[in-house]
Swiss-Prot record:
<feature type="binding site">
    <location>
        <position position="186"/>
    </location>
    <ligand>
        <name>Zn(2+)</name>
    </ligand>
</feature>
<comment type="similarity">
    <text>Belongs to the thymidine kinase family.</text>
</comment>
<dbReference type="InterPro" id="IPR027417">
    <property type="entry name" value="P-loop_NTPase"/>
</dbReference>
<keyword id="KW-0547">Nucleotide-binding</keyword>
<dbReference type="InterPro" id="IPR001267">
    <property type="entry name" value="Thymidine_kinase"/>
</dbReference>
<keyword id="KW-0237">DNA synthesis</keyword>
<dbReference type="InterPro" id="IPR020633">
    <property type="entry name" value="Thymidine_kinase_CS"/>
</dbReference>
<dbReference type="GO" id="GO:0005524">
    <property type="term" value="F:ATP binding"/>
</dbReference>
<keyword id="KW-0808">Transferase</keyword>
<keyword id="KW-0963">Cytoplasm</keyword>
<dbReference type="GO" id="GO:0071897">
    <property type="term" value="P:DNA biosynthetic process"/>
</dbReference>
<dbReference type="GO" id="GO:0004797">
    <property type="term" value="F:thymidine kinase activity"/>
</dbReference>
<feature type="binding site">
    <location>
        <begin position="88"/>
        <end position="91"/>
    </location>
    <ligand>
        <name>ATP</name>
    </ligand>
</feature>
<feature type="binding site">
    <location>
        <begin position="15"/>
        <end position="22"/>
    </location>
    <ligand>
        <name>ATP</name>
    </ligand>
</feature>
<keyword id="KW-0067">ATP-binding</keyword>
<keyword id="KW-0479">Metal-binding</keyword>
<protein>
    <recommendedName>
        <fullName>Thymidine kinase</fullName>
        <ecNumber>2.7.1.21</ecNumber>
    </recommendedName>
</protein>
Length: 191
């Protein structure tokens, strides 16, 4: 994941909830800070589960971030001397994020995006599939299925302890009260 200083690139960390995507983003950003690189982290304003300002993992790790309403706002708030850009919860941004991330990487910067690759229905989520396609480095990580303990690649939404229906809205900000990590076999989406 390291290249010449005169080249930019895109890294994507994808997987279901509770797989450690945000922890990995924070780890990579902290390593860049140790290397004396200038970093900026962005997150969608709607992600206010644990903090309005910080990016916070389910495990409690956190790092300062800039909440933005849209992907275009990332360009507006990006400082000229930033070397490494982190973007958490990338799935919540519009498809314009793909163009913005490409533009930033084309300007010799490292961009790290973390997000859910699939929604609770098991379908590609937001700009993540396109980001994964254009990225130089993609890490698809797994959680542990909360039913059978096998590797989990999906996010199960629960409503009153039961699987959400296919007709339910895609975006619902929540944590353990609303979601579980599930494997392919244990994941359910009733019609």
């Amino acid at each position: 994941m390291y290249g010449p200083k005169d080249h930019g690139w895109i890294e994507v960390v994808a997987g279901p909830m509770y797989s450690g995507k945000t922890e990995e983003l924070i780890r990579r950003i902290r390593r860049a800070e140790i290397a004396k690189q200038k970093v900026q982290v962005f997150k969608p304003e709607i992600d206010n589960r644990y903090s309005k300002q910080d990016v916070v993992s389910h495990a409690g790790d956190k790092i300062q971030s800039v909440p933005v309403k849209s992907s275009k706002e990332i360009l507006e708030k990006l400082l000229d001397d930033t070397d490494v850009i982190g973007i958490d919860e990338a799935q919540f941004f519009d498809d314009f994020l793909v163009e913005i991330v490409s533009k930033i990487a084309n300007n010799n910067r490292r961009v790290i995006c973390a997000g859910l690759d699939m929604d609770f229905k098991g379908e590609p989520f937001g700009p993540m599939p396109k980001l994964m396609a254009i990225a130089e480095f993609v890490d698809k990580i797994q959680a542990v299925c909360m039913v059978c303990n096998n590797p989990a690649t999906r996010t199960q939404r629960l409503i009153n302890g039961k699987p959400a229906k296919k007709s339910d809205p895609v975006v619902l900000i929540g944590a353990q009260e609303s979601y579980e990590a599930r494997c392919r076999k244990c994941h359910r989406v009733p019609r």
